[in-house]
């Protein structure tokens, strides 16, 4: 596996994107990825089409991994799954299923309400792993727990590595 992985973290949240609140989940993801040796770029955008635009820009820039946080719930403004799902050429539903299961096992009543999606987006530089995660810091910590032992293998597989 290559030493340096380029990752993008996209926070989907109306208040932080307008400067009216602090983004707490994006920095958690960025810190975790940087600790794994990734080069990390971060952006905060309003939910909806700006999320899809940020994901497309990351793919076009050659990112190997894009993690979004926020916009996966059931409020009228939560649109991240709807705008990211059409970009996927391959779905990987087990990742989000596991994140939900971890939250539910901890007794988080709202864990089943996250509607995240995960998969691959085809770009001119190859395929990019895109995973849409909850916006809460607890949901992000659960996701990190799921992804930490899996991420190197996942990225290697996407690059064409063996099982």
Identify the function of each model-found stretch:
Residues 1-163:
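Non-catalytic beta/alpha edge segments that cap or flank active sites
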């Amino acid at each position: 596996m290559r030493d340096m992985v380029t990752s993008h973290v996209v926070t989907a949240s109306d208040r932080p994107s307008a400067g009216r609140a602090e983004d707490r989940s994006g920095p958690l993801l960025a810190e975790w990825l940087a600790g794994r040796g990734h080069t990390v770029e971060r952006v905060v955008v309003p939910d909806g089409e700006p999320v899809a635009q940020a994901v497309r820009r990351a793919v076009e820039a050659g990112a190997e991994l894009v993690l979004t946080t926020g916009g996966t719930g059931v409020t009228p403004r939560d649109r991240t799954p709807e705008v990211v799902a059409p970009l996927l050429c391959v779905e990987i539903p087990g990742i989000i299923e596991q994140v939900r299961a971890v939250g539910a096992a901890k007794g988080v009543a709202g864990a089943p309400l996250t509607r995240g999606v995960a998969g691959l987006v085809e770009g001119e530089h190859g395929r990019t792993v895109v995973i849409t995660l909850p916006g809460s810091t607890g949901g992000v910590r659960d996701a990190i727990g799921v992804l930490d032992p899996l991420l190197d293998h996942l990225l290697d597989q996407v690059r064409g590595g063996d099982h």
